[in-house]
Structures are given as structure tokens and as C-alpha cells.
């Protein structure tokens, strides 16, 4: 059912977009000049949860182990859930200062972070300076289009030797993961047309044929973002993960008592805070 309504929405939106002025130059904007510095793919998605321990336990039932966490006074304030050596979920607990659960940010992994940063600056964007973050990797951020909670916080990282992520390579890769790759992230936007224009003409993402709001990131990862109306998702996260064997994934979920809805070639799971996980075989 989710796929059915998404297809209807995209078809209607495609007709509307084709009627807008200026879109004839979109394809040309993708090929003019030097290609943008490539991304390796999605590095992580950050989500705030109401009960960190319960969320960690839920994702462990999906086969995703906690690689490490960050603590203050021996109390965890960030948990890193491992999908594969290059992709993680970052879970943050609610607090008195930050009481709202849901999607926080999306982070892209760059091949050369300084090259991406400098490319953005030359095109008039205003990323923060590249710095070394707490886990030991390079990082910069950029403000994006308006989401339900405010301007999107877009993160960019480059894994560095000796970082917590690099030191965990080959570890915490559970044999019973229900999926092994994060391939798409939905971004709820207040104005989908403005957000689409920003990602295509500012960040140089490429529109996917017949899916006007699905956009491939620069590089050869094939991973994508999906621009969706804020009313359809609110502050929830919606992630699409790739499973090599959906039948096996369904059996693993059943074994752990995790409810899943099957719709064609998609399994839909909801986490304790209502965030949506789509398992697909592509």
C-alpha cells in the first residue's frame, strides 16, 4: 500500500513539476562544468528516541549491534548502531532540553571531505569549516531546506584512521542482520519543490527517471534521498534498507517477535518511536 500511494503521488507531482518554468535547465545543470566531488554514500542517520536502552534493544533484535557509545559521567548520550562498516544509526535520548523524538539529521560520507567543502564554497554555499568530530572523523555541516522541526541540518563526514568507526571495522557485524545496507532516506520537507531544487541545483544530486522526488547523490553509490511532504511523515524517520533475502529477513523478524507488514517486495517495520524501516530487495 505504501508503494502504491508513493507511485500515485510521484505521478501527480511529475506532471506538476513539468509545468513549472525553468525546469528545462535542470538536466543541463547536471552536466555543465566539472562533475561534483563524489560521495561514498550515506554515513548515518541520527534519531532522537524516548528510551535509549529500549531502542538499542529493538535494533539489536533486528541484528544491528551497538558498535560503541559516547558517555558523560558514565551515562550514554549517543549510541552508534552498526548497519555495516560504513553505515550507522545514531540514537540520542530525549532530555529536558531536547524532549522531542524523531529524525535529527542525515550524514553523507565523502571521498574527500575538503574537496566537497571547497566545491560548495566556490558555488556560494556556506558550510561550516571542516573539523575533527568527537568520534575522530572529519566533519562539516550545512543548513538545508525547512523541515518540520526547522532548517535541515546536513552533515558530511570522512572516516579517518584511528577513529572509533575505523577501529570497529570488521566488528559488530551480526550474522542475523535483517538487512545489510542503508540505500535511501526520506526527507520530510515543508516545501517539496524548494527542497528538490536545492538538492539538484545546489548539492548537484541527480533526479531519477520517473521518480521526480527520488534523487541520487553524487558518486557511484546508487544511494538516494526521497523528498516527501512534511504532512506525510512529520518528524518521523523513514529509512529503506536492502536485504539480500526478504524471506530470511521475515523469518528473523518472526523469531524475534517483531511485527512486519509485507507489501509485494517490501517489509515494513516500525520502531518503538514510530520511525519506519522499509526492507527491500533490489
Role assignments for model-derived ranges:
Residues 30-35, 118-181, 187, 216, ...:
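Vicinal oxygen chelate
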